[in-house]
Amino acid sequence: MKLKKLYIFYFDIYEYFLCDLQLSETNEILKYIKNNIDKYTNSFNSSYIILKDFNIITNEVELQSYYNFTEDSKIKLNNTDLILFMTPYKIERIYSKYNRNFNQYRWFYILNNIEPAGSYKINMSNLQNINIYDKNKTAYYCKNPKLLFLTPIEIDKFIPVSRVSIDIECQHFGEFPTPNKFPISHICIDWFMESNINPVKKIITLINYEIIKNYKGEQKDRFIYTEIDELLTKDKVYITIYCTEKYMLHFILYTLRKDFDYILTYNGHSFDFTYIQGRRKFYNLNELCLVNAHKSNELKIYSYNKDTTYEIDSNNGIIFLDLYNYIKKIYNYNSYKLGEIAKERFNILSKIIDNGDEYIIMPLDTADNKNKVSIFYDVIRTANYCFINNIPYKIKDKTKIINDKEKLYDPISIENSLYQQFKIYKNNTPISDETTKVMLSKDDVDIGNKNAYVNFTKDKSDDIAYYCTHDTVLCNCIFKYDMIHDKVIAFSNEYLLPQYMSFKYKSTTNISGLLLKTLFCNRSMIVSGNLEFEKFEGGYVLEPKQKYIDSITAVFDFNSEYPSNIIEANLSPEKVEKVIKLQDDEYAVDIVENYLKEKYPYPDYCYMLIKKDKTYKFIVMDRRKPGIITQMIDKGMKSKNEYKNLKNINKNNPVLYNYYTSALYSKKITINSLYGLLGSERFDFNSPYCAEYCTALGQKCIKYIKNLVDKSRYIDNNLYLNEQNNPFSNEPVITRYSGNLDVNFTFYIIYGDTDSLFINIKFDNKFDNKEDLVNKSHECFQFLSNIINDEKNIILSKNFNFEYEKMYIWMLLLAKKKYIGEVVSSMNPLQLISDSKGTALIRRDCTEIHKTILKNTIDILKEYLTNNCTIQDVNNKINNYLMFTFKNIIENIQNLDINEFKKSVKYTGIYKDPNFYIELCVKKYNSKNPNDKIVKGQRFDFIYAHEIDIWDIETKKWNTKYTS
């Protein structure tokens, strides 16, 4: 049998210390280190690099006033020779203003021109074979990584990614299990050792027979490594072993010593692995350890972020990935429980057929299901329940999907299962919808019940084993279908971090890798200065001009507005030429502005005048050469467009398509985070002036387009825009543009928000039908988009694109950032979908009864906007509906569905008042539910209620004094 070959490469990873050359010659410690390196060049495991004539830049700015605004106040630092020490120990207690907190791996990647997740052709002659701790592996030492990774290559084939998903269950009797008291009852392992040569995919279930009542059957007491090696080679997918708990603990250690790329758990860093460590301690076993090339290390589980996030750092190439931490970092969900996450991902639209004591589920062949069906049928193979309207239904028959559990991973069986029907048992909740969404989640087995382990029989243990199996498969499927490995690769390359650190840090730390790389490419280094951070105005939001819009409205927005602003004005901290602050003196403002126009002309420079309260502030930027931050944005934007193009080109190659999708995602995050970092005091190269300029330029651009387009007319095939000056060059723009639309109309700006405008169109003549109206409106909006974005018209600079995004046929503009309407999703045939922002319809903290009342009220208003009803008819309908609804609630208050009155809130655990009602509610709940506690950052449901001792006539009046 052909086996894959695994090599381990050893490199020298140093501690890095950067300072100017002069300091290295005057400081006694640095001088001693440098002399030793020079003296013992070949034997001393340290070195240094001289960085000649580096450009030193700073974010510090000297504020000017009316009395000195003509003076040159730009802080200019001389070029300097720097020295970068590379030592096996950390150089401490020596201050160097150049020694930023750059991760040691980033220096390694940059100095050796290596992509952390790149592919390279390796010349083995650059390696030296060495003996290592693990005798089963081949290892090499590399003295010159730059030479070794000289030839990058592109891989368009699937590179196997091996992972193992682990889930444990523990014995308990109603209280939360603790390792010093309760044994582990089950460990389930989804062993997914992918390989192009010899893949091994198993579901291994370990069951503690010692706690099973009157257990009789095959059992394992002594763990023998070679037995497991042999077992894994057998052609059997499901392996169930009844064993002692000690055997289970040895098996976990055996698993961790295999060459997996990922160890997957869900909340396993804070519970599963901590519990396993505790049980090993209970038996006086050594703690779990990881074997790397040169030694064995104990598995270290640590917490930061106030004990809400637990991490396991790996030093042997395995990535310990807690999917709970990953989901919380990447997504914003109501709940981060595995069951709720699964429902979000694994669902399809299906037809429901009532068939006696069962329902038949028939998935629909729709566009919405197209990208979901293969995922759904992969997950359902181990599921025992499905969920409809959040109600669990036990699966009765899925033999058309999988009739032999040994075919769990069989690709032909999976392919043949797509769109096959399955049956579910009926329960106390009938399904009234003919078509509905069917979701997969954790199985509806309440192992948290205090009686789950009472009279614990083999049958009971097997039921829990099925549940445990499905949990591990869910984790594996989340990993697979969320393309987590592709994201790890993309973020690793983007942040210049080892792959196991891809999701570890926040934006301020993540971006420092790209910052260092850009600085190094420019032969530059930063010196941070003292800056004043003041609050400044945010994005420009217009008040809605109308509430009820019964005509066609388009949404236009600036594509990547803030990154475009940074490129346009060269908003990099070292490019701030002047900041002049004036008091409330318009005469002085005019003098300063005229001076700046003459002394700092566009396009070499640009400036922004910002008025706040009774002060004026001029910020002048040097545009002659792109700054460091501008280069980062510009390169990121170009890469984003390149990845977008490559993604489309490779849509038939799933490997490259997934890679470019994730690369595009990581680029977007980087590009969009830089504006916020400029205004963050935690970022090394920040600038409140650049951040304020960026926001002000955004306001200026959106106001400019608003003033240019609002009430502009298209008459006799000519569009007449309003007279405006270009916001960048201050030159007047052309206002007349010819077309061939053959209609007369007027554009109205009815709303705007930060980077977008809502443009309403009013035609002089009526159309015969809705389709013609929509088609012509689309044509007119497209014409406007072409006019604004055509570089020949010089309405915008080349860095900006004001895109026509979507079109509403009616809208309700309720308030700023709150609107509802119907969007055109397809032109031919005409199809509409509902859309809303900021309303209770999509807010998580609003009750269902609130959403229902709002939705029905909107439907009445929609009828008014689309069917020419009178306003009086609409008012009557709304009043009658609301009166009926509230009367019905009051009269049936004893029989109301409590679920309709639930509110949702995120528990922060940080409240000024210790008696705050949310804090008291959570503490009370957690004391009663120790095995299902609400943790910090988790969203939960609650209701406002008052306990009634006697239900009398007075209480029935529902007086507010009885509510709390």
Swiss-Prot record:
This is DNA polymerase. InterPro entries: DNA-dir_DNA_pol_B, DNA-dir_DNA_pol_B_CS, DNA-dir_DNA_pol_B_exonuc, DNA-dir_DNA_pol_B_multi_dom, DNA-dir_DNA_pol_B_vir_insert, DNA/RNA_pol_sf, DNA_pol_palm_dom_sf, DNA_pol_type-B. The gene is POL. Belongs to the DNA polymerase type-B family. Catalyzes DNA synthesis. SMART domains: POLBc (SM00486). It comes from Choristoneura biennis entomopoxvirus (CbEPV). Pfam families: DNA_pol_B, DNA_pol_B_3, DNA_pol_B_exo1. It catalyses: DNA(n) + a 2'-deoxyribonucleoside 5'-triphosphate = DNA(n+1) + diphosphate. Its EC number is 2.7.7.7. GO terms for biological process: DNA-templated DNA replication; viral DNA genome replication. It comes from the Viruses. GO terms for molecular function: DNA binding; DNA-directed DNA polymerase activity; nucleotide binding. Keywords: DNA replication, DNA-binding, DNA-directed DNA polymerase, Nucleotidyltransferase, Transferase, Viral DNA replication.
